């Protein structure tokens, strides 16, 4: 026999479960999937990770579909240089990118002969390996691996193509309330070096 109360109770349960799931994903933690090789060797294609949503406070991008429920960012905590951060790319304010934070507001970032400079100071690095291979798209390429250390002591491994030309760039001056991000797979990453597609990332675009 058709039980109307049973359907109502199940609908309520599903509704409450949906509200709880949205709350957890918006306020506490959210799963993300790594779709590209731009963060290799530290994050691999297909890796799944959970991202803290409260680390840097909250903006509209903390919530599904980025609803304009308030402006700016609340409970803001400044991210640290070297943090791996998920953000909405400024090009469309929809696509999630995950990169390493290199430049803080006011910093000057530059590449000279594939060596990273922050505020005119070369970033210390040790060569970790001459014989690594890494993916760029669906191709496997030979790379040099380096252990880089940022001014605040944050360390990570970064890789550069062996047969790539030296990277030389203009100086990127990070605007107020913005950040500069790089992929660890330096020759296979679309990041803040590409001003038309990513560029500087405003603090309101940080997800976690």
Question: Where do the model's predicted regions map?
Answer:
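Soluble "head" domains of membrane/secretory-pathway proteins
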Residues: 2-8, 23, 27, 32, ...
